[in-house]
């Protein structure tokens, strides 16, 4: 099966973004990550930082869900989700590419030529990596990982009604802590 689009979902600190970029480089195709946030910001008029932050939080609370669309129209989060959906589908339609995050696995689930990948690793590997790569020092790395993963899972569940990281929702799951970041990119590129 030829895959025109590869989606990379990932646990925070697992190297998924790096794996996506390396895979795209090996295949000579574009990798979209921060570009999605920039496009959404341009289209909506929201600041890129706001778009990034909102993409990590599921709209919450009883009042938010009970009143958002019925009484007051769509929330900012709903507007961003609609734009995210559009940007991801437009990028996939342009041609072969790698898309990192942004619920692309769900958005493109009915696309026959899409390879859906989930990257994970154990807590020790990820904690060490976020300190080395991002200089995380504000709170314990483990706390930061749990918080970020919890937010990603909640956001994914809210908009997709699917369990984030659940193996059956992906074609391939890879443990970057065991396999290595470079080798993960090699494996994905070989499956393309």
Residue positions per predicted region:
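ATP-dependent small-molecule kinase phosphotransfer cores
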Residues: 41-96
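RNA pseudouridine synthases
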Residues: 91, 104-111
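Pre-Walker A (Motif I) flank of P-loop NTPase domains
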Residues: 2-11, 95
